[in-house]
Structure formats: C-alpha cells, structure tokens
Amino acid sequence: MSGAELIIQEINREAERKIEYILNEAREEAEKIKEEAKRRAESKAEWILRRAKTQAELEKQRIIANARLEVRRKRLAVQEEIIRNVLDEVRKRLQEMPEEEYFESIKALLKEAVEELKEGKVRVYSNERTLALISSRIEEIRDYLGSISIEIGSAISTMGGVIVETEDGRIRIDNTFEARMERFEGEIRAKIAKVLFGG
C-alpha cells in the first residue's frame, strides 16, 4: 500500500471518529433536551393540576358558602313570617279582649301615663269604645288613680289603649296598643324567636 493510500485511510478514520463524536454529542444533547422538555411538561402538568385543584376547592367553598347563605336567608324569612303571624295574632287578641280584662288594662295604662306626667289634670284620647268605657266607669277610674281630674278628649283611630296628655297639651304619653307594640317590638320579637327557634 502506497504512502498516499495510508494517508487517505488515516484521513477517513479521523473523519469517521469526528463524525461519531459529533453524532454522540448530538444524541446526548437531544436526550438532554428531551429530558428537560419532559421535566418541564411534568412540572407544567403538576402546576395545571394544582391550579385545577385549588380552583375546584375555591368553587366548592363558594357553593357551600352560597348554600349556607341561602339556608340562613330562607330560615330568617320563615322566622320573620312566623313572628309577623304571632304579632298579628297578638293584635287580634288585644282587639277582641273581654271588656272587664280590657278595662283593667286601660286602668293600668292610665296609671302608668299619669304617674309619668305628674299632673293633677289630664286629657285622655282613644277610640270611641274605650272613651265610652272610661266615661261609664269614670268614678272607678278616679278611685284607682287618686285625686286626678280626667277630661275625655276626642275619639282617635286606634285599636285600643289610650293617649294621655297634660291639660295644656304640651306633654303627651302615647299608651295606645300600636305605640306600645312598636316600642316593645324588638323585645317581643326576641322573646318569640327564643320560644320558637331557641335564640
């Protein structure tokens, strides 16, 4: 074999070695890229999964919170309706109170107002039924109240009770059933709620 052929063979071998080296480098790089891509894909998949779980949990909490609010709203609506019905029944019973019981109630309301006004002469307003009852039993009321002069005022629109004012009309105590129920409605509601709903 001539010297030229030997040189050519050596060149070919060197070229093959270089090609093999380059191919190995390329394969390794490709493997690294594949591994990195796989790692990134897995990492992204985990992130997507975590985000989906977080969103699902948030949605679950939102649905539960909304459901609780809806239950509470419906419970309060039912509670309010029951309380309203009870208050309506109280009003109805006050209007239908037997006369003797009603008279005792009027005496107590008059006494409360007179004691608050601290006046020797007062004027009383109420509906026609109540004014007629007071007029027909005025002596009994005077005995009950003590040395108080009572003037019967004009009839007003009320389901019961009395308005009592000083002779000059400057101070007025509204002891009608409506006014008293309005004043004590919060307390009445709380009592009804406690009895019916335990709080």
Curated annotation (Swiss-Prot):
Keywords, comma-separated and alphabetical: ATP synthesis, Cell membrane, Hydrogen ion transport, Ion transport, Membrane, Transport
Any Gene Ontology CC annotation: plasma membrane
Pfam family, one: vATP-synt_E
Top-rank lineage group of the source organism: Archaea
SUPFAM superfamilies: V-type ATPase subunit E-like
Chief location category: membrane
Keyword Transferase applies: no
Signal peptide: none
Entry membrane topology: Peripheral membrane protein
MF terms in GO: ATP binding; proton-transporting ATP synthase activity, rotational mechanism; proton-transporting ATPase activity, rotational mechanism
GO term, biological process aspect, one: proton motive force-driven plasma membrane ATP synthesis
Keyword RNA-binding among record annotations: no
Cell location: Cell membrane
Disulfide bridges in this chain: none
Physiological role: Component of the A-type ATP synthase that produces ATP from ADP in the presence of a proton gradient across the membrane.
Protein family membership: Belongs to the V-ATPase E subunit family.
Assembly and binders: Has multiple subunits with at least A(3), B(3), C, D, E, F, H, I and proteolipid K(x).
Name assigned to this protein: A-type ATP synthase subunit E
